[in-house]
Amino acid sequence: MNRFTGKAAFVTGAGGYIGGTIAKMLAKDGACVAVCDLNEETALRTVREIEEAGGRAIAVACNVTDSASVDRAMERAVTAFGRMDILVHAAGGSARSAMKPLIEQTDEVIQSVLGVNLLGGIYASRAAAREMVRQGEGGRIVNISSVVALEGLRGCVEYAASKGGLIAMTRSLCKELAPCGITVNTVAPGIVQRPGETNDAVHTNFLGIRCTAEDVAHVVLFLASDEARFVTGQTYAVDGGRSLAMKGTD
């Protein structure tokens, strides 16, 4: 039996590279997946790939910066699957800001980055936690942060703040939800490369290899599984050791 047979998952940003890979791997391992994305077309593309592989999924258009939109999306997922067991907040790719000193950054970019990365995580976690608490069978919440939140990086102040906020939220929320058997953890990837990309990212980690979305997804699936039942409030860096050498300025 697959690890997630009988489980329902809600993945934000699942029309993107990392979120889509996580959604597909959850489905391959037996989960029913709500593929949530601001862009419904990209969500549908992920759903088609899941269905072609024999999995079950629905596409849900969702603006994670709007709490009402998140609540509606969660309601639709629960209606479709009858339950909710796993949340992965992976939305954020479209909110990446151009690297600029904070004194040059615009309000629009700052609000967008904080809205998608941090507020989106808070809204999605609240919606999922409500369903998990109501069910009374525990659950798993996994937020996608970044190694930038661990060590800082010039030109990314608002991005680091938003991803660092997810880590702080994880540490607090895990304490609130622990009595309900719900774990909350964070995964902090380094530079994740798409197939065919070539750049110097391979030189920014100790292992000297490229990080793929699958590398991130493997850790997410562990944290979403029963194998991680005794793991909560933690942040897992998936970066080949890069965060150990960043020193805030690299």
Regions found by a protein language model. Name each.
Residues 2-34:
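Canonical Rossmann dinucleotide-binding motif of NAD(H)/NADP(H)-dependent dehydrogenases/reductases
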Residues 83, 178, 183, 231-233:
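Short, small/polar-rich loop/turn modules that mediate ligand/substrate recognition or access, typified
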Residues 94, 99, 151, 221, ...:
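Short C-terminal tail/terminal secondary-structure segment
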Residues 98-102, 106-111, 201:
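Substrate-binding pocket helix/loop in short-chain dehydrogenase/reductase
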Residues 125, 162, 170:
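Active-site helix of classical SDR
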Residues 130, 175-179, 229:
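Alpha-helical segment proximal to the catalytic Tyr-Lys
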Residues 146:
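Residue(s) in the substrate-gating loop at a strand-loop-helix junction
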